[in-house]
Every structure is written in C-alpha cells, then in structure tokens.
C-alpha cells in the first residue's frame, strides 16, 4: 500500500485465526478468543478502495467472502478488519498462536 503509514507492526485483536489453505489467513473476531497478531496502518480512502478490491469486498453486496467491520482497539483507536463467519469455507486449520507470519515460517521449515 504505497503511501500508507505503518503505526504498529505487531498489534492485537481478539479472535481465532485460520489458515485458509489458499495462502492467506481468515479471521473470526471474538472478544473471548485469543490474541491475533496484525499490523496497523493509517490509510486513505483510495487505500481502502484498493483493499476492498483485493479482498473482493463490496459494501453493497449481500454475499462477500469477507466482511469489513470497524473495530475498536484496546487504546480506543479504530481500525477496519476483514472477518469471516464460522461457517466460511476459509475456516480450515486453526492457527493456535494467532500469528500468521510465524505460522507460515514454521510451515516452511517443516516442509
């Protein structure tokens, strides 16, 4: 995301992170879940449009693979999350650590 400013390379939301089996993760947001690691960026409207296109998300469409939700972080700031529902076909293998980057590195080292 050219021009987007990274505020935090290791921040957290609560939920369950899954390996979709397609090379990217899927998040179920759940305040009772474990910590899920992410990055926080300051973006503009064009960045948001680009992210929506990347995630194949359309605000006016009834059936998206992901839903974009506004989330409040522990410090009171807000961010958007792209989340799935528990019945999503992307919910495959639970990532117990909640850390996608660690998960993919560990998978590479065991293959």
Swiss-Prot record:
Active site: residue positions: 55
Keyword match Methyltransferase: no
Intrachain S-S bonds: none
Broad enzyme group: transferase
A Pfam family per the record: GGACT
Top-level taxon: Bacteria
Record's keyword terms, sorted: Acyltransferase, Transferase
Binding site for substrate: 14-17
Enzyme Commission designation: 2.3.2.-
Entry's Gene Ontology molecular function annotations: acyltransferase activity
Similarity remark: Belongs to the gamma-glutamylcyclotransferase family.
Function per UniProt: Putative gamma-glutamylcyclotransferase.
Protein name listed in UniProt: Putative gamma-glutamylcyclotransferase BH1612
Organism: Halalkalibacterium halodurans (strain ATCC BAA-125 / DSM 18197 / FERM 7344 / JCM 9153 / C-125)
